[in-house]
Amino acid sequence: MEKSPSYDGSGLVNLIAELERRMTGSSPFPGLEGGLGPTGADTYVLVLFDGLGMAQLEHPDAGVFRTSLFRSLEAPFPTTTSVSLSTVATALSPSRHGQVAHLAWYPDVDLVVNTLKWVTVTGDHVPYDYGGLLPRPNLWERLRKAGLEPITVQPRDFQTSPLTRAIYRGARFEGAWNAEDLVDATVDLAVVPGRLVFTYVPFVDVAGHVSGQGSEEFATAMRAAATIWEGIASRLPPGAALVGTADHGLVEIAEADKVLIRDRRFDGLRFAGDPRGVHLWGDPGLLDDLAELVGGELVDPLPLLGPDPTPEAISRVGERVLLAPPGTAILPKGFDKRLRCYHGGLTAEEVEVPLLLG
C-alpha cells in the first residue's frame, strides 16, 4: 500500500492551518513544516486549481507553475474534490471534518450520495442540511470572529449549489463568468487588508476527466489556468500575498483498464467512494474475492483519514477500502465509467500537489 498522506506538516491541511495561524495566531491543526516564506502580508489570496497535481506540472503548458513551485504538498485521503475542499474550509483532516468520499455513504439518509452534486447514483436529488455538514466553527467563521473577511471567487453558476452551501458557510461568495472575471475579481478583492480570498479554478480537472491529458482541450485548460495565475500574480496589490495549490492530481485510465464490477456474486455488497479507492461494506469473504478479482488491495480506511476520527467520519467510511492497482479504475454500478482520468487513490500522481508562491 502507498503510505498515508501527511497531516502533520506536509499536507494540504497544514497549508490551510499555516494561513490561519498567520492571520489569527492559531489553528486546530499544525502549520506547514518549514513555513511559507516571509510573513507580514495584510491579505492572502489562495488559488486552488482543481486537478493540478505535481504530475500535471510536467505538461508543456505548465511552465509558469514550474517557475512558481515552492514545494510539494500531500492531498488528504481520499484524493477527491469534495474531501479536499472540506479540508480547505475547516483546516481539518477528513477524520475530523467528516467528509470521506466522492460517493459517500450517509447512514442518516440510508443513501450513497454524490457529494459534488448531492444526488444519488441514479441522479435523484438528496435533500439535506447542507449548511450543517461541516463542523462549527469552520475556517471562514473563525476568520470572521477574528475580524477578518473570507471571500470565495467561483464560477457564478456554483453559487446556489448544495456543495457551495456546505463548503462556504460563513464566506462571502463572488461569482465570475469566465477566466478573465476570476482574475479581475480576485485582484480587486485583494486590495482591502484583512481578507482571505479563496479562488477556485475548475478547468484542468474538467478537461482531464472528459478529454484526457493528451487532448487539445486539456492543453487549453492548462493555458487558461496558467493565464489566471500569471494575471493575478502580475496585478497583485501591495500588501497581499499569493499562494496556489490543488486538491488532487489525475491518473489517466485506458478503456481496457477499467474494471467493471457486474458479477452477481457481489450484489450484496455496498459500494461507495471513488474508482481508485472503493469503500466497501459486506461479507469479508466476498470482499477478499473482489480484491483478488481486480488485483487491488483491501485496507483499513480510518488511519488514512487522519487523527482522532469523529463519530460522523466513522459512520460514513467503508468497513474496508479497495485500492485499485496502478493504472486501473474499479467501477461498480453507479460509478461513472465514461471518464478518461480518475483520482481518489494513494499513488503519488493523485496525492502530490504543488505549493505555488506568486
State where each predicted segment sits.
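Feature captures the catalytic ectodomains and active-site-proximal regions of enzymes
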Residues: 1-358
